[in-house]
């Protein structure tokens, strides 16, 4: 192909890709009653997701906005899909806006370096025991929880997610550029939230935002931050 034709072709393809991205990203909307939300596509086996997790929730809590988690277990990770299905199970064991499921995700991220496909079940049992939850003999026998994980993954593919974490700050009228793989600090997210809040259209306030963006325990946050820095708690 001649150089100038190749350049034109690449330009057209890039324009089409950007157009498709904008259309696809528009499917992301805050939950009812919220003007702004954080959307996170994550993989429980992903080290960058573990690093981003406390920053996301701290920023969300500071701004009193909800976090919308989507499972995106990467095929190269051999236990992340099973962990995501178990997180969905723990979601069903608590009526407080998935509080127990989010605590399980936090727990997995905090212990991620020690978890393997071979010992994952032991960590799940330990978490269940600590939280006085009885585990089923067979998790998700009808495949409904796995189907939800797969649906999240399919949505991610639809809107162009390829890496984890991929994070958007969205409003009811706009979508930020995505943060992909790396979240440097809480201020980065906070600035994006402030920008989205300015762009958002008026909306009814969430009566109890803490139920949608639950606070992480300080001890757990400190433990997570130390582990991310390579310091034992």
Q: Which role does the model predict for each range below?
A:
Residues 1-7:
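Positively charged n-region of N-terminal signal peptides that target proteins for export
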Residues 7-19:
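Bacterial N-terminal signal peptides
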Residues 20-25:
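Boundary at the C-terminal end of the N-terminal hydrophobic targeting segment
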Residues 31-32, 60-62, 79, 158-163:
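Extracellular/periplasmic catalytic domains that process cell-envelope and extracellular macromolecules
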Residues 32-46, 67:
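Short active-site neighborhood of thiol/selenol oxidoreductases, capturing the structured segment around
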Residues 44, 50-128:
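Structural alpha/beta surface segment adjacent to cysteine/selenocysteine redox centers
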Residues 53-54, 125-233:
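C-terminal cap of thioredoxin/glutaredoxin-like
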